[in-house]
């Protein structure tokens, strides 16, 4: 299955605790917890461009599977890392955070971020 498409956040679990652990200020956590972000993924072979729009904030990362890339994190920090693909999963380690994005079916994208024992899970549905 191709990741290409636009996905809108439907539900999330563990947002507040996870964002506190990564050092996001309380006011930003409060503003962000109810915003339904939109993720747009463009897949062309092993090349990906991921754009996440949350309110007025737009975060865009481009990478090639298996090659080092400069990725911007949720907190605005830039990290050199490698994104790997395992079937319908994209896996990347950003400092202490492990992110797994899985296309569980043609219309559902699940992003699970893990930091120590904390888990932040985002479930998005395809809108285009």
From Swiss-Prot:
Q: Which InterPro entries match?
A: Calycin, Fatty_acid-bd, ILBP
GO terms, biological process: fatty acid transport; response to lipid
Q: One GO CC term of this entry?
A: cytosol
Would the keyword Coiled coil turn up in this protein's UniProt record?
A: no
What coarse category fits the chief subcellular location reported for this protein?
A: cytoplasm
**Where is it expressed, tissue-wise?**
Expressed in the yolk syncytial layer (YSL) and subsequently in the intestinal bulb in developing embryos and larvae. In adults, expressed in the intestine.
Q: What does the entry say induces or represses the expression of this protein?
A: By a linolenic acid-rich diet.
SUPFAM superfamilies of this UniProt entry?
Answer: Lipocalins
Q: A Gene Ontology MF term for this entry? A: fatty acid binding
- Tell me the keywords, alphabetical order: Cytoplasm, Lipid-binding, Transport
Cellular location(s): Cytoplasm
Protein family according to the UniProt entry: Belongs to the calycin superfamily. Fatty-acid binding protein (FABP) family.
Query: What is this protein for, i.e. what is its function?
Result: Binds free fatty acids and their coenzyme A derivatives, bilirubin, and some other small molecules in the cytoplasm. May be involved in intracellular lipid transport.
Q: Any further remarks? A: The zebrafish genome contains duplicated fabp1b genes (fabp1b.1 and fabp1b.2) which probably arose from a tandem gene duplication event.
**Comment, domains:** Forms a beta-barrel structure that accommodates hydrophobic ligands in its interior.
What is this protein's record name? Answer: Fatty acid binding protein 1-B.1
Per UniProt, what is the name of the gene that codes for the protein in this document? fabp1b.1
